[in-house]
Amino acid sequence: LGPFRDAWRRGDGQAAYHVAERDLALQPEEGTQLLQQVQGHLLWQAYQSFFAVIFWYLLLGPLAALAYRLLALTSEHAEQAALRERAVQLRHAFDWLPARVLASSFALVGNFVAVTRALLHELLSWDIAAAQLVIKAGRAAGEMPAPVMGEEGVDTLDQLWQLLIRAAVVWYAAYAVWVLLI
């Protein structure tokens, strides 16, 4: 995110667009949507690369974590449509529980009222995608203001990063308590 942050901080929207397309594989439509898409990208990448893997590792061990990661890669890069569709369905099932645990963690370390208001009817829904749930919960917990160019926009990325760190600390603390009790 470094080059994007630099371009956004300078107020150089065109450079930010190019960096988002090149480095993050995002296809933004409008200037304000670009920052929201990058925020969503940050939350989703942190979820699928760290939180979901850690969740399955702690719950079922290294094979489950490896299986999740391989399933994620298959759903993103499979060339056969049938294989990709099946991997997406299995990944949705694998993502259901850790995404909700992360959303709950966001509520604990962020704005609890905003998260419960935003996700009250969707938290237990099977139909909502994990990415949508994580992004919505992260933005609500972080109390994201309207996107703006410049330093204020970059600050929202820092706020989301701090939210992710606090959520990781909660997960580690919960795991430590669990280990002590068992």
Region annotations inferred by a language model:
Residues 1-182:
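Hydrophobic N-terminal alpha-helices or hydrophobic patches in metabolic proteins across all domains
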